[in-house]
Every structure is written in structure tokens, then in C-alpha cells.
């Protein structure tokens, strides 16, 4: 415990909040190019093959981002838009790819929560 005098000489420093999405640089979305598209397994107790992509952003960052929805058309050199938002059971995945923008197609036959998956309204 510091004395009053020590606190006068050197006041307490506030704890700086750590940025959860550093690659975004305070932007809502960022554009990037897929360098690798692959599947990975979630941590315990979940089990699946989650689709993820390694993306090189326009600002030079290289990040791992999640591809939401069922089925996708992404491959190497696809141009994608990413947003912040982690995937709780995939360590190191802090970004999501936005479906229905640039080279990413929307989810086929999606009827509910369509806007989140870039799906057009069914006829």
C-alpha cells in the first residue's frame, strides 16, 4: 500500500482497456483477400468442423476470420469484407466474414435472419 506522499509523487495509473479487434483500427468493416480457407475444430466440449479463412487486410494485418452460415464459395484470392466479433469456441478467431458482399455469396435457401447472411427474400 503506497503512502500519501508516494501517491502525490506518482499518481495511480488507470488500467487501459485492451482492444478486442486491433486489426479493425476503429473501422466498422475492413476489406481483405483470403490467403487460406480451411476448417478447424472447436475447443471442448463442442465438436464440429468450423469453416474459417486467413485474410490479409488492406492495412497489412493478417487475421483469422469465421465464415458463418451453411456452405460458402470462398477460396484463395477471394476478396472479402470482415467485421469484428469473436467465435467463442474457436481460440484466436476474432472476426467474422460478412456474407453477401464482394466475392462472398449469401447463404442459399435461408428464410430466417436473412440480413445476417446476405440472403435475398424468397419469392
Swiss-Prot record:
Gene Ontology biological-process entries: translation
Top-level division of the source organism's lineage: Bacteria
Cross-referenced NCBIfam families: rpsL_bact (TIGR00981)
GO cellular component: small ribosomal subunit
Classification via HAMAP family: Ribosomal_uS12_B
Summary of the function given for this chain in its UniProt record: With S4 and S5 plays an important role in translational accuracy. Interacts with and stabilizes bases of the 16S rRNA that are involved in tRNA selection in the A site and with the mRNA backbone. Located at the interface of the 30S and 50S subunits, it traverses the body of the 30S subunit contacting proteins on the other side and probably holding the rRNA structure together. The combined cluster of proteins S8, S12 and S17 appears to hold together the shoulder and platform of the 30S subunit.
Protein name: Small ribosomal subunit protein uS12
Gene: rpsL
GO molecular function, one term: structural constituent of ribosome
Origin species: Paramagnetospirillum magneticum (strain ATCC 700264 / AMB-1) (Magnetospirillum magneticum)
Gene3D superfamilies in the cross-refs: Nucleic acid-binding proteins
Keywords for this protein: Methylation, Ribonucleoprotein, Ribosomal protein, RNA-binding, rRNA-binding, tRNA-binding
Keyword Ribosomal protein: yes
Family listed: Belongs to the universal ribosomal protein uS12 family.
Chain residue ranges for the region called Disordered: 101-123
Assembly and binders: Part of the 30S ribosomal subunit. Contacts proteins S8 and S17. May interact with IF1 in the 30S initiation complex.
Amino acid at each position: 500500500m503506497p503512502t500519501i506522499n508516494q501517491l502525490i509523487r506518482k499518481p495511480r495509473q488507470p488500467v487501459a482497456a485492451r482492444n478486442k479487434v486491433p486489426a479493425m483500427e476503429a473501422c466498422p468493416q475492413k476489406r481483405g483477400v483470403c490467403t487460406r480457407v480451411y476448417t478447424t475444430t472447436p475447443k471442448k466440449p463442442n465438436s464440429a468442423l468450423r469453416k474459417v479463412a486467413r485474410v490479409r487486410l488492406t492495412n497489412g494485418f493478417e487475421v483469422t476470420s469465421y465464415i458463418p452460415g451453411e456452405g460458402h464459395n470462398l477460396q484463395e484470392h477471394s476478396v472479402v469484407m470482415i467485421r469484428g466479433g469473436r467465435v467463442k469456441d474457436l481460440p484466436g478467431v476474432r472476426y467474422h466474414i460478412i456474407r453477401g458482399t464482394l466475392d462472398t455469396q449469401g447463404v442459399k435457401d435461408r428464410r430466417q435472419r436473412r440480413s445476417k447472411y446476405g440472403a435475398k427474400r424468397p419469392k
